[in-house]
Curated annotation (Swiss-Prot):
Protein name (Swiss-Prot/TrEMBL): Putative transporter YdfJ
Topology within the bilayer: Multi-pass membrane protein
Origin: domain of life: Bacteria
Organism from which the protein derives: Escherichia coli (strain K12)
Predominant localisation class: membrane
GO terms assigned for molecular function: potassium channel activity; symporter activity
Transmembrane segments: 8-28, 29-49, 75-95, 98-118, 133-153, 158-178, 226-246, 252-272, 280-300, 308-328, 352-372, 374-394
InterPro entries (UniProt xref): MFS, MFS_dom, MFS_trans_sf, MHS_symport
Reported function: When overexpressed in human HEK-293 cells forms an inward rectifying potassium channel.
High-level lineage: Bacteria, Pseudomonadati, Pseudomonadota, Gammaproteobacteria, Enterobacterales
PANTHER family the record matches: SHIKIMATE TRANSPORTER, TRANSPORTER YDFJ-RELATED
Keyword line: Cell inner membrane, Cell membrane, Membrane, Symport, Transmembrane, Transmembrane helix, Transport
Further remarks about this protein from its record: YdfJ may constitute the C-terminal portion of an ancestral gene disrupted by an insertion of the cryptic prophage Qin/Kim. The N-terminal fragment may be ynfP.
Length: 427
């Protein structure tokens, strides 16, 4: 919820509150830049808290990360504006965004690791999809709050004080999440492996992950989902409103409806992956995004279509290119990595993919759309991200129901057993 609150704020109002002296296009690019700053911080947070999670446990790290994110999100709601303190306003905004990003870097990976290690074989996909459903619930809540603000407030009221309400209201979610995690038990897989006290169970050196085929495949899988998420949920909403002058209710209402439908899409994909494996659903969803990107975008940006038609097109591409892939992401990555490095490698692969694809994607989309004066770069980037996700899915091994206590990563060559030569028997 915290990141979606910010992403919609960056797309819809921050350009006027924190960058009012820039042109419309440049202000949107700068606002997307503050969005991207959080993704840079997420990599650092993924490394720090991922290593901690593999050493001291999943539970403690999840408590730390949710607290960091919640406090920063609430503080954004009390920031002074550019009109009040000038350039220090965006500086403070970026500072809070970076601290928020540090916690976010291990938040979803930690939750995904925890649920995967709790779930029994045969039900990991559906159970792990609860992480995506929780994130989707946050997206829905954030979108609903912003939509409500746009509905009840005038533009002047929204820019004067209304934009603060979504961030201040997040304190309720933070308190509940902290209470929930204080009462959480540690992952049984983590306890089992660490109780064994085996020398071979020590975490591998941090640099070794970059030699892992599983690490790069996971990063590629992340491109398809995270890149499309940044373009569709963040940039496209701002592009429709600021550049094409659409009613703000069109993208916010469409994303809200899409998030509601996601409560069917996400568990269905999780259940399906328990039946037919992780690879095939990944291949289907990425292929669908590639095929649908151009026709759906051509409808979304065309004002000659009815608002309902535009919203349907946005809902379709969002479910195929974002929510469907997110349903598969956490369990697939958890099963791809060995138990002693799972948290670290899952978090860093997700955040590297997120930084490159989603963190910088909206900025590049803004630049390319301004240069070309068209929506074509958005569709091309969605297809490109989905192609990377598709190739990664085709190359990855099937990891469904893999032993989560295994030390090695799934895509690595299995160690060969060298048998000692047997002495020949004398006749």
């Amino acid at each position: 919820m915290d990141f979606q609150l910010y992403s919609l704020g960056a797309a819809l109002v921050f350009h006027e509150i924190f960058f009012p002296e820039s042109s419309t296009a440049m202000a949107l690019i700068l606002a997307m830049g503050t969005y991207g700053a959080g993704y840079v911080a997420r990599i650092v947070g993924a490394f720090i808290f991922g290593k901690m999670g593999d050493r001291i446990g999943r539970k403690k790290v999840l408590f730390i990360t949710i607290t960091m994110m919640g406090i920063c999100t609430t503080l954004i709601g009390v920031l002074p504006t550019y009109a009040q303190i000038g350039v220090f306003a965006p500086i403070l905004l970026v500072t809070l965004r970076i601290i928020q990003g540090l916690g976010a870097g291990a938040e979803i990976s930690g939750a995904g690791t925890m649920l995967a290690e709790y779930a029994p074989k045969g039900k990991r996909g559906i159970i792990s999809s609860f992480v995506a459903m929780g994130t989707n619930c946050g997206t829905l809540s954030a979108t609903a709050i912003w939509a409500f603000m746009f509905f009840i407030l005038s533009k002047e009221e929204l820019l004067a004080w209304g934009w603060r309400i979504p961030f201040l209201a997040s304190v309720v979610v933070m308190v509940f999440a902290i209470w929930l995690r204080m009462n959480l038990k540690e992952s049984p897989v983590f306890e089992k492996v660490n109780d064994s006290n085996q020398p071979t169970a020590k975490p591998a050196p941090a640099g070794s992950m970059f030699q892992s085929k599983s690490f790069w495949l996971a990063t590629g899988l992340r491109f398809g989902q995270a890149g499309n998420s940044g373009l569709i949920q963040t940039f496209l909403a701002g592009y429709l409103v600021q550049t094409l002058l659409f009613n703000k209710a069109i993208p916010t209402d469409a994303l809200m409806i899409s998030s509601i439908l996601g409560f069917m899409t996400i568990p269905f994909l999780g259940w399906l992956s328990d039946k037919i494996g992780r690879r095939i659903p990944y291949i289907i969803m990425n292929t669908s995004a590639i095929v649908l990107a151009w026709p759906m975008l051509s409808i979304i940006v065309d004002k000659s279509y009815a608002p309902s038609t535009i919203m349907v097109a946005l809902i379709v591409i969002h479910n195929c290119a974002v929510l469907g892939l997110f349903a598969l992401e956490n369990i697939t990555m958890a099963e791809m990595f060995g138990c002693k490095n799972r948290f670290t490698r899952m978090a860093i692969s997700k955040e590297i993919g997120g930084l490159i694809a989603s963190g910088f994607g909206p900025i590049l989309a803004g630049i390319f759309c301004t240069m070309t004066e068209s929506w074509y770069p958005i569709a091309i980037m969605i297809m490109a991200y989905s192609v990377i996700g598709l190739i990664s899915a085709l190359k990855m091994p099937e990891v469904k129901d893999r032993d989560l206590s295994a030390l090695e990563d799934a895509a690595e060559d299995q160690p060969r057993v060298v048998r000692a030569a047997q002495p020949s028997r004398s006749l």
